[in-house]
């Protein structure tokens, strides 16, 4: 069977679902997950989300993040993370995530890891679950986004050294999905670095 979409997204964690929600509503999007849509590491994450406290906090946020990564991070990527963090948290709030508030009704920022100031927003001790549930609800309300659960991404479809889709296996049936764009949001990024013994 062949299927044609504008965007094929492999993975239903925060990266995959948030990507789907940030695409143009006119695009036909297919999100593929190997299990149920809620069976992701996002759902299991307990901590919070780092966010710059304001424009003046961005340089310190960048430095804290670089230091935590032993300066192996790509500086440009860390700068984007820091600069866009406030807008992304606002968007998550607009989608319905109810981050914890302090006694004055403001976001309750906590401190984790290598951060030198309180800049972590959270929902109790189940931030990942809250984010996942909100994103799943939002994706399910978008008519241009289709979800394939219990579906395996087997391989990419390549033509002239360019990815033009993916081969899926669903209910023992092969589905060739042709897409203008393919987003691999499969998790496990931390495992791609060669480890050293110290």
Give the positions of each predicted feature:
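Residues forming the flavin
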Residues: 1-65, 101-103, 124-198
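Short secondary-structure boundary/hinge segments and terminal tails
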Residues: 40, 83, 108-111, 156-158
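Short alpha-helical interface elements
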Residues: 54-56, 73-74, 86-90, 113-117, ...
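Rossmann-like flavin
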Residues: 69-108
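Helix-loop-beta segment of a Rossmann-like dinucleotide-binding subdomain
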Residues: 71-75, 106-133, 190-192
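Catalytic phosphate-handling regions of large nucleic-acid enzymes and associated NTPases
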Residues: 99, 112-114, 155
């Amino acid at each position: 069977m062949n299927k044609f979409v504008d965007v094929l997204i492999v993975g239903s964690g925060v990266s995959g679902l948030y990507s789907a929600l940030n695409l143009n509503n006119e695009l036909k999007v297919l999100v593929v997950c190997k299990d149920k849509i809620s069976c992701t590491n996002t759902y299991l994450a307990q901590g919070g989300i780092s966010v710059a406290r304001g424009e003046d906090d961005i340089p310190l946020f960048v430095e804290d993040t670089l230091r935590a990564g032993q300066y192996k991070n790509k500086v440009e990527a860390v700068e984007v993370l820091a600069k866009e963090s406030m807008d992304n948290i606002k968007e998550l709030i607009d989608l319905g995530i109810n981050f914890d508030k302090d006694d004055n009704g403001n976001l309750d920022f906590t401190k984790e890891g290598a951060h030198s100031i309180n800049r972590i927003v959270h929902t109790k001790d189940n931030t990942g679950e809250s984010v996942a549930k909100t994103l799943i609800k939002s994706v399910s309300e978008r008519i241009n986004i289709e979800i394939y659960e219990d579906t395996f991404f087997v391989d990419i479809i390549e033509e002239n050294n360019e990815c033009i889709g993916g081969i899926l296996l669903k209910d023992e049936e092969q589905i060739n999905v042709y897409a203008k764009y393919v987003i691999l949001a499969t998790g496990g990024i931390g495992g791609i670095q060669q480890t050293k013994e110290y």
